[in-house]
Amino acid sequence: PGTVTCNENEIIVEFPSYVGTKTLHASVVDPLGVEMLNCTYILDPEKLTLRVPYKACTRAVHGGYQMSIRVMNNSAALRHTDVEYQFFCPVEQTLEFSKSAACTKDFMSLSFPHIPTGLGDSTMVNESQMGWMVQAGHGPGAQTLSLEEAKGQGFGVLIDDNKMTLSVLLNATGVTHYVEGTSHLHTMFLKLSLVSPGQKMPFPSRAICLSGPVTCNATHMTLTIPEFPGKLESVSIENRNITVSQLHDQGIDVEAINGLRLHFSKTVLKTKFSEKCLHDQLYISSLKLTFNLELDTVSTVINPECPCDSPASIVSGELCTQDGFMDFEVYTHQTKPALNLDTLRVGSSSCQPVFKAQSQGLVRFRIPLNGCGTRHKFEDEKVIYENEVHALWENLPPSKISRDSEFRMTVQCYYTRDDMLLNANIKSLPPPVASVKPGPLALSLQTYPDESYQQPYRVNEYPIVKYLRQPIYMEVRVLNRNDPNIKLALDDCWATSSMDPASLPKWSIVMDGCEYSLDNYQTNFHPVGSSVTHPEHYQRFDVKTFAFVSEAQARSSLVYFHCSALICNQHYPDSPLCSVTCPGSSRHRRATGNTEEERVTASLPGPILLLPNGSSFRGVGDSKEHGMAGDVTSKTMAAVAAVAGVVATLGFISYLCKKRTMMLSH
């Protein structure tokens, strides 16, 4: 009678224009030709359409619905006609595209079950008269193409006995592209219609694809989703579905900035061996993201992997130079992302490059083998010299600096046993005249992973992560002194929330060489054994981490430690601090001192990051926290465990009372 369209909930019959609008009469009948009185249909003579719902108007058969209509036309041209027509529409859900598109670098693909060519009465339809039409996009900008036209605009169709697969290039007609940084998201609305004389069967579908690298640090993998009209409904990892409201409890945090950023804790990630990585690679298998996109549910499945770590060692050349230097070059585009050449440094020193060309993205170093923090070791027949280059990534936001924001590269060179031997004539100079003027006192304050005090934390490992009430092992030592007759006398140690030792507020941990008696978690002193040359030049103790409070509010979780000390003559102690016996009245000892000593203050090379015991960072990374927890300043973490307010108040009062000056003497 015209064109039949099978939609999701109804059948639409469009009658040809030669049927008069005033003479058209149509009704729905059962297979015996009896009108179905309980069927509610809509006949529009003006538009020459008949809309019939499946419910109560069709008969369910295998694979779909069957409907019969009777058309009566009383026009003079056709005289009186009464014709019955029968239609078949497949079940909608068996013909839908797959809900998740398969995504690759260049295209997305969808599949749905193969559609039989016998639509309606197979005896009346010639298979050669059937064809496919593709509608790409929706709204005013939608384009309807024949299958051949679609193939020329980025579409491909593969039909086998089981299913039809449609592949679409990401730059094809109807594909919408969204970008945020290096992350890309593509969406597509597609309606594939099977058209035959008098019948049209549409199969609408939406698809979404997400691509681009993830970023990883010491604690999390971060996936960026560009901003687009869809709304995230759930995340599924290996068929374990997690709703948005449950994400935080499952180790996934959501950050809504220019789209979405999903931060997956390392407890969610898996590890696998990878030939392209030095160490095991972190990844998520079958990560399914489900969105609500314009009242439709769409999903995409990806398998994100953390990028490999930077190479641990790069040999700069076979041999060190004959004049005792190591030469190497660093290019800004040597890594992805590129390096910020202004942040390059060698080891912990301030050695500068000998050549720098910003236009070429090149920096050249020439570092001495006996300076700039260069180390050496012996392996077989070689003496290997090595140093470490540090740099930040280019265009790194200031709030995102963390341990994983830094590029590290070890450079090496070596001498072999067969290298040329140099003859040197060394003349001994007369010893210098002894100076009786005391030199400046230099102190070092360091922290160690444990009470063995074997290897201190390196400068580049700060901030160091510690949890509340976990001990911090510290050591104060005298530098550049070999006199066995002197000893180090500890004065005060305290903590501040900024780098300035004189900043307020401050919290005392050692006072007058003894533990601070008003502290709930008092400092413990450790004996210095014979493992060092001059044990009297050292002071070792541990501090229990605590939450610093000021004016009843928790301070920043980044804490800076400082200590002051002086040198004593072991045989002629001339200061009360030189003969401290703890516990005792330290205030009285200081008040009775007749001499003033010059005290010297030393600070830790960097801050300590204090985390609450329940922090999600715990258990991630090295078991001794010999490293950083990542993204330190991207999210300020407030210390949670509160010390009694009276501790901060009394500590502040103590600071005001401690106005004094001491002079250094030996």
From Swiss-Prot:
Stretches the record annotates as Disordered: 417-439
Assembly: Can form homopolymers that assemble into long fibers (in vitro). Polymers of ZP2 and ZP3 organized into long filaments cross-linked by ZP1 homodimers. Interacts with ZP3.
Protein known as: Zona pellucida sperm-binding protein 2
Location of the protein in the cell: Cell membrane
Protein's UniProt keywords contain Glycoprotein: yes
Gene Ontology MF terms: acrosin binding; structural constituent of egg coat
Gene (name only): ZP2
Functional note: Component of the zona pellucida, an extracellular matrix surrounding oocytes which mediates sperm binding, induction of the acrosome reaction and prevents post-fertilization polyspermy. The zona pellucida is composed of 3 to 4 glycoproteins, ZP1, ZP2, ZP3, and ZP4. ZP2 may act as a secondary sperm receptor.
Domain notes: The ZP domain is involved in the polymerization of the ZP proteins to form the zona pellucida.
A GO BP annotation: prevention of polyspermy
Domain ZP, residue spans: 319-585
